[in-house]
Design a protein with these regions (language model features):
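Terminal alpha-helical segments
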Residues: 2-154
Length: 154
């Protein structure tokens, strides 16, 4: 693809559905399925780190689990995924693609998880260290987003 000067082309490059088909054929496992599997592993890691008292890691993997689930569902629904780490934007795009209404609680949780992308990765990104309450909120929000997505698809 040739760059035409449109900055959006860099941040949200087109991913034609045909490319997903080529990748599926090459990898042997559907791309969406690969996103789901990794999302499930990250969800398990979020719980594991929470149980071990590793709260920043629990929040990091909760955010990642939601991101991977949503990317997989977007690929499944539309044939592509946007280039963003915003759980809020991903869930909003998915619900729009499905013609479903995004509940306020899910939107709030998606925004909360989005904030964890930077805060949980870098020790100097937050004023306060992560604690048990933070990790519980991350896990609750992951469960809320996950449950809402699966309910909407069923």
């Amino acid at each position: 693809m040739r760059y035409d000067g449109n900055i959006q082309q860099i941040y949200n490059p087109p991913t034609p559905a045909g490319l997903i088909t080529v990748i599926n054929n090459y990898l042997g496992t559907p791309v969406a399925e690969r996103w789901f599997r990794r999302g499930e592993r990250y969800k398990a890691l979020a719980y594991e780190f929470y149980q071990r008292g590793l709260y920043p890691e629990a929040c990091f993997f909760a955010q990642q689990a939601a991101e991977f689930l949503l990317n997989g569902r977007l690929i499944e629904a539309t044939g592509s995924r946007p280039y963003t780490h915003s759980i809020y934007h991903l869930v909003k795009m998915l619900f729009e693609a499905l013609g479903a209404e995004l509940e306020e609680g899910v939107a709030r949780c998606a925004k909360y998880l989005t904030e964890q992308y930077i805060g949980s990765r870098y020790p100097d990104a937050r004023m306060l260290d992560y604690d048990r309450w933070d990790a519980e909120q991350c896990i609750k929000c992951l469960e809320e987003v996950w449950r809402s997505v699966e309910k909407t698809l069923s």
